[in-house]
Amino acid sequence: MNALKPLPAKASIIIVGAGIQGLSLAFNLSELGVRDILVLDAGYWQGGASGRNGTLIRGAFSSPEWTRFFAHSCELWQGLSKRLGQNVMYSRRGYTMVGERSATAELLDRTLAVHKECGIHSSLLTPGQLREVLPALAHGRVSAALHLPDSGVAPHHAAMHAYRQACEARGVSIHYRTPVTAIDQSAGRIGGVRVGDQRIASDTLVLAGGAESNALAQMAGVPLDGYPMRLEAMALEPTRPLIGPAVALLDRLCYMHQTARGEVVGGAEVAERPQHTLNADVPVMAATARAYLEMFPQLGHARILRQWAGLVHISKDFGPLLGAHHALPGLFVSAGWCYGHAGAPAAGELLAKAIVSGQVDERMRPFAVDRFERNQPVVEPGIVLSHFE
């Protein structure tokens, strides 16, 4: 295993963070011919958000910027098993966005128009179609539902295993439990990193450390928008098949799907201040249970198997921070990911191309690291997350 190998004295590119973002980037860099790629992670295998997410793959949102980016990522998910040579277990079961309020129905009307503009295959379901797609849903509560047939789910454990195997087969050196303790600069640009007393030279560094993104940016001496935030999820005991597609209950800030084993997995967001903890709590559990019970009454008898929390890095507009850092040549960032599992294939591909060629793809450009300094946030009204007050 690469983790048993000694650290090199230098690397062509160092990636800090070996979650799905870091591994996707490493794989794509290797596909572009980059050698001597080093990936360092302070935690254990699948110990971060890449091992603690809801596994949903959503291929479109309500803004053109998010839709174009995540539609590309969804398309890449569909061919990812063949490309990696490992089964990522992507299931194209669809994704249904459900609205209860009239204002949410209007949002879904506008969302459909965005999808048509972007060439996305989606449709507003009639009451009859919705009963076919989600027969167990409390239809009397629904004002509108928009369905994305090409979206679905992909278990994080399968995707992470596939990316890691593909990276190591291409010679990428991956080291877990290897925290970076300092970031060096030389002549006004990135010069390398330090792991304890050892210095590893490199003129290209990528910060893909999830919830530790702000701490890593501080280490590099550069500003970075955003903050770490705890998200929680719940799994119910297995039950008979009730929910076919993945589901977003927009008005309840709740997302969910049913696994092949029959467990309903998902979570609801509640307004809370940013917390750097993995402790699960009762308010989120109660909000999730209420959403399940009211919108899928047949789940009322099901017991909660487990509730867990994961840490992500959230930007001001909830969008990714992706690309070169404007304050330090040689430094790149992949942060701000509240939908990092779904966006990993596109992020890895587009960021790798930007690093190697210097050309920024139009689907990636809106998520530039310095967009807030330029007063150009990306407004996305269709996310299932809560702002804190």
Name each region found by the language model.
Residues 296-389:
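C-terminal catalytic lobe of FAD-dependent flavoproteins
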Residues 68-71, 97-106, 146-165, 279-286:
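Short beta-strand to alpha-helix junction loop
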Residues 7-21, 38:
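Beta1/beta-strand and adjacent pyrophosphate-binding region of the FAD-binding site
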Residues 146-203:
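Helical element adjacent to the flavin cofactor pocket in flavoenzyme catalytic cores
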Residues 54-133, 283, 291-293:
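Dinucleotide-binding Rossmann-like beta1-alpha1 core, especially the glycine-rich loop
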